[in-house]
Structure formats: structure tokens, C-alpha cells
């Protein structure tokens, strides 16, 4: 049996409106700071992904990737402007020039020929998390279970490809556009598990005082990089 997939899964309108408000704030704050610097701007496209990129209590873009990107481009004579994007449209946006690069806990594995890369600058584990009291202990226990993943993300690719022999063919995969929703779905018991970067899951647990359990065996250990358009010849990589 092939994996089943629902291309969208929605929670209530309040959750989605809150996520949309955060997206709008991230874009406007990043643009103002870059303009005030007086340097030529580089538009960095990402979605909100604590602890890599998010808004602090003052509404200013911050996080691991924000700090690295800001300093790296400053040394090259540019000011990084952080713009929140629809993650599903990331390739079209960078190829069209709407953004200069994709930077936000972005896995290089399997995408080496799709973009012009700088990196890897960090290693990350893609993992499955379940409720703390779940009977799921390994990937093989996912048979007949429902897993939420971010649409166009690496975990979605792994589950839908059917290429990993550790993963049962009867897993139902729900693809979510906004990754914050997948965390909420697990916390509310709407799904049996989620798959994402381990650091992001740990940050969500810390920020929201929830108790997930991360399976010991990772889906993937991957390098994180900065993706430019394939034909970008500016030497920014």
C-alpha cells in the first residue's frame, strides 16, 4: 500500500490568523533594519523557524540563522533583509529574483543540483517526535499511524518516496504548509507524530511547556546550507 497524503490540514481559524500575523511582522521589521544600515540589501527568504529565525519580544528578527546571515553579509558589504516567504514557493522565488537566497534551517541533502549552495555551515538531525506517553518507540512502530510534516520539506520527501526500508508503507502523511501548525496538531492529539528538525522540536517544547518524546533513530542527518539560484553568478556563495 502506498502512503496516503492530504495536501493540507487545517486547525481553527484563530491558529492560522496568529501565524499570519507573525509572518507579516517578520517581513516589515527586517526591511526597516536593512534600509537603516545604508548598505546594499540582500533579501533572505525564510519562514519562521525558532531557534533559527523568529521575532524576539521587541518584534525584531533574531535567531541562529539571523545572526550568522547578518554578520556574513555585513563582511561582504551587504545588509541582510529577512523576508518571510511561502515555503512551498521558495524555489520559484529565488529563481525569479524575488529573494536573493533561501536561508532558514534548509537541508542540502538531495537538493545539491537544484540550487547554488553555500555550506554546509551546520549539521542537523531530522527526527520523529511523538507524545511522551505514546507506544511508538521506533520508526517501525509507525505502521498505521498518522504523521504531520511540512509541505515540500525533507521529511515529507522521505516518507512519500517509500525509499527508506525502516518506514512502514502504511503511514498516513499529512502535509502542512505552516510548520507551527504541525506542532500544535501533535500537542492536541490530532496526529500520532511529527517529523522535523530536532532543534526546532526541542525549541517548541521549551517555549510551550509541552512534553514530546523524540525517537532515538533519526530520519536523516543532514548539512544545512544557504541556497542561491542555480544561475546566480554574483559570487555570494
How should these model regions be labeled?
Residues 2-18:
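N-terminal secretory signal peptides and thylakoid transit peptides that target proteins
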Residues 25-28:
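C-terminal motif of bacterial Sec signal peptides marking the signal peptidase cleavage site
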Residues 30, 63-75, 133-154, 225-237:
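Extended ligand-binding regions for polar small-molecule ligands
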Residues 30-36:
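Bacterial lipoprotein signal-peptidase II cleavage site
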Residues 36-105, 113, 175:
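Extracytoplasmic small-molecule ligand-binding "clamshell" domains
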Residues 46-48, 123-130, 206-237:
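Periplasmic-binding protein-like
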Residues 54-58, 69-78, 154-176, 205-209:
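Ligand-binding cleft/hinge of the Venus flytrap
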Residues 89-92, 105-114, 158-162, 185-220:
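A ligand-binding cleft/hinge motif common to bilobed small-molecule-binding domains
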Amino acid at each position: 500500500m502506498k502512503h496516503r497524503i492530504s495536501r493540507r490540514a487545517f486547525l481553527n481559524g484563530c491558529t492560522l490568523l496568529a501565524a499570519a500575523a507573525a509572518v507579516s511582522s517578520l517581513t516589515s521589521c527586517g526591511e526597516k533594519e536593512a534600509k537603516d544600515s545604508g548598505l546594499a540589501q540582500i533579501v533572505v527568504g525564510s519562514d519562521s523557524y525558532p531557534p533559527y529565525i523568529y521575532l524576539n519580544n521587541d518584534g525584531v528578527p533574531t535567531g541562529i540563522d539571523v545572526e550568522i546571515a547578518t554578520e556574513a553579509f555585513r563582511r561582504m558589504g551587504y545588509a541582510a533583509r529577512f523576508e518571510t516567504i511561502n515555503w512551498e514557493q521558495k524555489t520559484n522565488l529565488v529563481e525569479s529574483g524575488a529573494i536573493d537566497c533561501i536561508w532558514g534551517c534548509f537541508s542540502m541533502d538531495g537538493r545539491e543540483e537544484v540550487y547554488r549552495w553555500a555550506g554546509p555551515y551546520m549539521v542537523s538531525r531530522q527526527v520523529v517526535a511523538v507524545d511522551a506517553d505514546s507506544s511508538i518507540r521506533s520508526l517501525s512502530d509507525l505502521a498505521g499511524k498518522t504523521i504531520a510534516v511540512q509541505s515540500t520539506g525533507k521529511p515529507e520527501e522521505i516518507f512519500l518516496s517509500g525509499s527508506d526500508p525502516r518506514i512502514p508503507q502504511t503511514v498516513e502523511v499529512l502535509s502542512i504548509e505552516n510548520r507551527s501548525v504541525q506542532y500544535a496538531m501533535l500537542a492536541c492529539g490530532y496526529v500520532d507524530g511529527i517529523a522535523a528538525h530536532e532543534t526546532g522540536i526541542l525549541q517548541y517544547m521549551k517555549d510551550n511547556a509541552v512534553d514530546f518524546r523524540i525517537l532515538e533513530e533519526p530520519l536523516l542527518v543532514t548539512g544545512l546550507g544557504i541556497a542561491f539560484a542555480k544561475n546566480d553568478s554574483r559570487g555570494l556563495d
